Amino acid sequence: MDKIEQKFIGVWELDEWVVEKPNGDKTFPFSGNVDGFLIYHSEGWMSATLMQKNRTDVSNDRSKIAKISHLLKNDHEVSLEGDLLNTTKNYFLAANGYVSYAGEFNADDINVYHNIKTSLLPQWVGTTLTRRHEFTLKNKSLTLSAESDGFKDFLVWKKV
C-alpha cells in the first residue's frame, strides 16, 4: 500500500455534506440532517454509508414484504392500497434517504478511487467513483469532492 493510501486507513464520521449547484447556490442534502461513516481498511478495502437521520421505521413483517415484492416484480399494473401502499411508501423513503457501497480502493496525490463491488444502487456495481481528496488538521479531517452534471459535492469527514 502506498504512503498516500495509508493516510486514509481508519474510520471516518461524516461532519458535513454540501452540494454546490451549477448556479453557485449551496444546499445541504437531507436538509443537513445526515450521518455517515467511511471506513478504509489496510487490505485495500473500503465501505461508505450515508443516511438521512430520523427516517420512518419500516415493517419487519416478512410475509407482507414478500407479498409486495412479488406484486411489484410480477404484476406490471399493480395497484397497492392501504397498508401495502403505506409499507411500500415507507420503504421507498427509507431507501431514498440512504446510500451505501463497498469495494476496493486506491489513491494518488489528487484522487481516491472507490472500485464498487456492492451498492444499494445497482448501477454503481462494477464502476469506479473518483473523489478528489484533501487532508487537513494533521490528517484528522478529510474532504472528498466530486463533480457531476455541474453539481459539486463536498463531504467533510472527521477521523474517529
Description of each model-found segment:
Residues 1-160:
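Lipid interaction determinants
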